[in-house]
Amino acid sequence: ARARSVAQGKPVVLAAYQSVYSKASAEESEQANKLTMATLFSHGATQLLAGEGGNVLVDPYYVNNHKAADSTVEMLKRWYDFLVEHDEILMDPRIAEVTDSFAGPLNEDVEVAYDNLCVTEDPKEGAVWRRVTTTPHGLVVHLINLVGQKDTLWDGPKRSGILVEGGRLTLRCCAGRTPRVFVADPDGSGHLEELRVHCEGAQAKVDLPPLQVWQVLRVIL
């Protein structure tokens, strides 16, 4: 947010080189990279990573790059395609963080819950990290899966994500008006897909699909 405030409309690109690729297995490195990208993309930023010839940057000295596994190249293509497709709800400079205004114990306009799991406003190992932003195209809820991780170090090896099921989104809405909710997942179809909404008075409830690494929920109240 600070970088965007001084960027004067320029893209925010972090020199967040993933040195983990040169130190850990492709699987552990890809998981770390996914969590890094989920964090950056959901905040409207990207990183310096993809090099030439299927290599990834692991060091500020670009000669020290790493030949990416085929699975890494496919993953990066999938995630970059996702970023481009959903640019309007991820990268628009008018997007603002509103988590504290919409979620939490004092403001329950947007709530996400899972059985026997913590949902947090800050990244914490073992939890689902929830953020809410306002965009020109409605509210967006970001869910990032840190369940099963031992730490939140962005450039350290990460275990394969534990699939988190049983999530429910609850919205406070105007009686007689049904909100629309869409979900997208870079490790799923990659496209926004509409979810079924069930209204109970001033509340609308939505059963969420299983959470892999990152889900983007677009909410039109």
PLM features: residue spans?
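Glycan-processing catalytic domains of CAZymes
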Residues: 1-114, 120-121, 132-133, 192, ...
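Structured loops at beta-to-helix junctions and adjacent beta-edge loops in soluble globular domains
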Residues: 17, 144-146, 172-174, 209, ...
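Short, glycine-/Ser/Thr-/acidic-enriched flexible segments
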Residues: 19-20, 146-148, 176, 188
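Short acidic, gly/pro-rich beta-turn/loop elements at beta-sheet edges
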Residues: 24, 50, 151-153, 179-181, ...
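Carbohydrate-binding surface patches
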Residues: 38, 112-175, 215
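Solvent-exposed beta-strand/loop surfaces of large extracellular or lumenal domains
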Residues: 180-204
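C-terminal beta-strand-rich structural cap/linker in extracellular carbohydrate-active enzymes
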Residues: 200-221
